Structures are given as C-alpha cells and as structure tokens.
Amino acid sequence: MPIRTVMKANEAAAWAAKLAKPKVIAAFPITPSTLVPEKISEFVANGELDAEFIKVESEHSAISAVVGASAAGVRTFTATASQGLALMHEVLFIAAGMRLPIVMAIGNRSLSAPINIWNDWQDSISQRDTGWIQFYAENNQEALDLILLAYKVAEDERVLLPAMVGFDAFILTHTVEPVEIPDQEVVDEFLGEYEPKHAYLDPKRPITQGTLAFPAHYMEAKYLVWDAMEKARKVIDEAFAEFEKRFGRKYQKIEEYKTDDAEIIFVTMGSLAGTLKDWVDKKREEGYKVGAAKMTVYRPFPVEEIRALAKKAKVLGFIEKDISIGLYGAVFIDASAALVNESERPLMLDFIAGLGGRDVTFGQLDDALRIAEEALEKGEVEKPIHWIGLRKELL
Amino acid sequence: AESPFKADIERAQKELTEKMTPGAIAYIPGSSVINKTGSWRVFKPEFHKDKCVRCFLCYIYCPEPAIYLDEEGYPVFDYDYCKGCGICANECPTKAIEMVREVK
C-alpha cells in the first residue's frame, strides 16, 4: 500500500530519488535545495539506498560527477537551484550532447543581483536552450511524481536526454503538504532497471564519449539532440498515460481549468497554478468568463497543446515568474512562436509577476484581468508586457 | 618502418562514413589517428643518425607517440602526427635531433 504522509517538496524529491534507486548522487548544498541531498545522504548512511554519495566542492563539480557516472552507465541524481544551476550551465549542454539521462531537482529560485533566495523561475528558464527536458510541479506530490516521470522519459531509447524538475522555492521546498509515497514494487515496475545501450563503459567494448566533432560532424550531433527533444513530446504523453494507470494520478503537458466557455485564459506554471485556479473560482462566481491553464512541461515546449488552448480563448494571458531581459517573459515568447503560423490567434498578453519571491495576490491577478478585458474590448493589444505587483512608489 | 596506426586509420576512416551516433560516441577505438596533427607543426625534428646512440629516450619521451623504432633500434619520426613540440630534441643526450623550421 502507498504510504500517505506529510512532507516538504525537498523531502518528496529525495523520496522520489530513493524510489528510483540511482547508483550515484553528487550534490552541493544551496538554498533552498540543500535538504534534498541532505535527506538522500541520510538514506545512504542508513543503508536504505544503495548508492555512492559524492561530496563535491561546487555545483560545477556536482553535475560533472553525475555526467561521469552516467557516462559510465548508471542511473544518477542531483539537485540544485539558482546560482548553483547557473554555475552548472556549461555542463548542462555536455550532459544533453552526450545524451545522458541525468535527473535533477531544482528548487526554483531567483538569480543575483541583487542577491535573493526566494522563488521565481529564472534559474531553470534560463537553461531552456541546453537540451534538458523541463517539468514544473504545482505541489509536493507533483514534485515526487514528476521526478519518477523524468526518469521514465529521459531514459527512453527514443529520447536519452537529461531532465530537470522544478518546484518553487519555499512555497514548495519548505512547505509541508500531504504526499503519497508510492510502493517500491510499483515504481520498480514503472521504471525498470537502467540498462543503457549506448552510454556505458565496458573494457570489452572500448568507446570514446565526449568526442571532438569537426564542422563536418557537429551539426548532425546537435540535430539529433533537437530531434530527440521533438520525439520526447510523444514519449511524455505515453509516460503520463502509464503513470496514471499505475499510480492513479493524471498528468498533462497543459492542464486546463474551466476553459471551455472562457473568453480570457491565463496560463502559468508551478505553484502559482493553485493560486490561479482559486482565483478563477472566485471570478467565475462574480460572473467573469475566465479560465486557467497549468503548463507542466516547458521543454519540449507544448506547441500543439498551446495551439489547442489558443483556439478556446479570445485573450490568452501568460503569468510568469521570469523575464528575458530585452524582450518579454520566456513562456510568452515561446507561446508566441508556437502560434505564429496559426491563421487565427487570440490577443496575447504577458504578465511578469512574483520575481524574487514576491507573493502573487488575487489583487495582482485582478490587475491582469482588467488589462485583458481592456484588450478584449478594444480588440487589440497596445502593450504586450505588463509587470504586475510592481511597487510604483519605489520607482 | 610502417606506422603502427595503419589498421586503426583504415577502420576509423570506415567509421567516418557511418551514421552519427547518439551522443556522438565513437565506437571504434583509436579513431583519433585519422586527425593528422602533423599539420600543426612549426618546427620539425631532423634526425642525425651518425650521432644516435640508440638510447630510446626520444621514443620514451614523445608524448604523441610519433616516434617508433626500426629493426635496428633507431628512431623513426612519424611526421603525420609529430606536432614539433621539440621534447625529443631536448631530451636527446647526443644532440642527434635538431629542430629546424618547417618549410612548406
């Protein structure tokens, strides 16, 4: 029987890692993710998890150590956040380019400067071009489940790409919620033993990994990484379906909420989806035709799902905790690209919110709604990007 | 003396015509031999057999290795891979190896 208990998302991530039975874990402590490797080291020390726990001197070394272990042919795990993930940046490309199905938990935290330990998604959003699959969890149960799903998708022969699972700093990492720990046997059946066909070391089969590719070969290697990420779309759907069958919890790349007759739909990710759905309930009672959508998968970008969602809305608003300085929020930019060749598109708005841990309140969502309604009334968008919840008195 | 890499070069050249693998893994060991690094050379080791005492130091120190020994134990320089680092000339106790500017 699955155990129903209460825990923080960091603990849920550690439990997910334990259930997946990685052979090597390397990690370096960083707020708000420290508890993940701390808990795992406890599992290893207690003999509950048979794995090598490598203590390293930086996040760059942590990811490098798991790249080495994964290239040797075992299942691996690590966790980090913010500056730590930024320090891993160059090695993230290497993990993807070497097609190593590493899984990493991210306690989504802002980037310096100014230094700030609280939640936004800038750390992992900024890794969107590295070739890592990206999942975002709404709650602690999703943090656990999505890590198991990350292994399932990453290790699929059609994919073979690393995957990261993001969950919001403090809002989830340090908040205790009810979580169901699945049975080990069911997880074992779901994931199976990790048996790499390409990336493993065996003296009887000498190979070179991490090769040099001249201009005559580099593009093809990169194309295969891009192509694998394209193929991941279908594999993710299959994995979600199998997960639901085995564990009874349903996941979708984009989960819609009260969208069927909605004129205005807001899209978000992570824990903000909970706030948004609550707010939609309230606005529905007040007579507004609003809906919500939660993006669980950010890479590969859910192009088809965004197109289907766009068909339902007259105004599509993105509420995101990240900003691509020099343009708009990354989710809005990507969604715009997904819709660019559609003959009919909704009016589109981008709302930058909650950076550096600022609470996203109903009042701020009301502001976004007012801007969306104004666009709907006028039939055009004058300004696509709005920062909501800004303290104008400080500017 | 024939390059000991001849068979590797032939196998690796065959691999080059095969498909790109996931992770750009090279499945044939020794495939780096098809990259003729001798073209990087600025100075070339010139061998003076009359001074050579067959101590093998050049053969031992060559980091490539681009020096192998003929049947009599004299060094043979593989200019396909010798990058002209000059370590052999530096180590040679009888100055039997002289670095001369490469002329192309």
UniProtKB/Swiss-Prot annotation, chain A:
- The reply to whether Repeat figures as a keyword in the UniProt entry is no
What is the protein name stated in its UniProt record? Pyruvate synthase subunit PorA
What EC class does the entry list? oxidoreductase
Q: List the disulfide bonds.
A: none
What gene is this protein a product of? porA
Catalytic reaction(s) noted: 2 oxidized [2Fe-2S]-[ferredoxin] + pyruvate + CoA = 2 reduced [2Fe-2S]-[ferredoxin] + acetyl-CoA + CO2 + H(+)
Superkingdom is Archaea
Q: Name one GO biological process term.
A: response to oxidative stress
Ordered alphabetically, the record's keywords are: Oxidoreductase
Which species?
Pyrococcus horikoshii (strain ATCC 700860 / DSM 12428 / JCM 9974 / NBRC 100139 / OT-3)
Entry's EC annotation: 1.2.7.1
Q: How does it assemble?
A: Heterotetramer of one alpha, one beta, one delta and one gamma chain.
A Pfam family found in this protein is: PFOR_II
GO terms for molecular function, please? pyruvate synthase activity
Report whether Metal-binding shows up as a keyword of the record.
no
